[in-house]
């Protein structure tokens, strides 16, 4: 008779020990770069707006955008800027401390007037509250004013 009670007690303890713990979020955020279009063309001194839609299944934590010159790519240098051109690199960051699952990133970008002509890489990264990270990549060309396609 005691064995029935012990069995019932053990079964109850077993069921209580099974918690409803939420599973760990392993889903990476998603990024859709809306602008500039991949392989866009700009001139040194131009400005444009970086637009990207960030989303996560639970909560976004932060974002980062980086632009850097691709020194190995094809470039068009004009003789008047060859000595003064700089390999352009810039970075922007933002914290999303709330519990946002969606965020429209809108970041104005100004290309320096003395930016090196050639291909630049654009990297947009998103991090969620659990530490999952993802990145989206695109490129654009900084051209000389007199460049023709």
PLM regions with names:
Residues 40, 49-59, 69-71, 128:
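Extracellular acidic, Ser/Thr/Pro-rich low-complexity tracts
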Residues 19-32, 148:
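Proline/serine/threonine-rich low-complexity linkers at boundaries of modular beta-sandwich domains
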Residues 120, 133-138:
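Extracellular and select intracellular beta-sandwich modules with Ser/Thr-enriched
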Residues 88-108:
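Aromatic sugar-binding surface patches on proteins
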Residues 14-17:
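C-terminal motif of bacterial Sec signal peptides marking the signal peptidase cleavage site
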Residues 124-126:
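Conserved structural position at the C-terminal beta-strand
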Residues 48, 118-122:
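Exposed beta-strand face motif in extracellular beta-rich ectodomains
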Residues 99, 113-118:
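Surface-exposed, short loops/turns at beta-strand junctions within beta-sandwich domains
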């Amino acid at each position: 008779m005691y064995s029935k009670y012990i069995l019932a007690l053990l079964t109850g303890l077993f069921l209580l020990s099974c918690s409803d713990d939420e599973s760990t979020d392993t889903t990476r955020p998603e990024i859709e770069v809306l602008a500039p279009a991949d392989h866009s063309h700009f001139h040194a001194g131009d400005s444009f707006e970086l637009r990207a839609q960030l989303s996560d299944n639970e909560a976004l934590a932060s974002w980062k955008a980086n632009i850097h010159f691709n020194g190995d790519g094809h470039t068009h240098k004009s003789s008047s800027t060859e000595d003064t051109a700089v390999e352009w690199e810039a970075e922007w960051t933002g914290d999303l401390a709330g519990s946002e699952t969606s965020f429209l990133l809108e970041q104005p970008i100004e290309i320096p007037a003395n930016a090196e002509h050639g291909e630049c890489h654009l990297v947009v990264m998103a991090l969620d509250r659990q530490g999952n990270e993802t990145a989206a990549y695109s490129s654009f060309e900084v051209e000389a004013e007199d460049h023709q396609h």
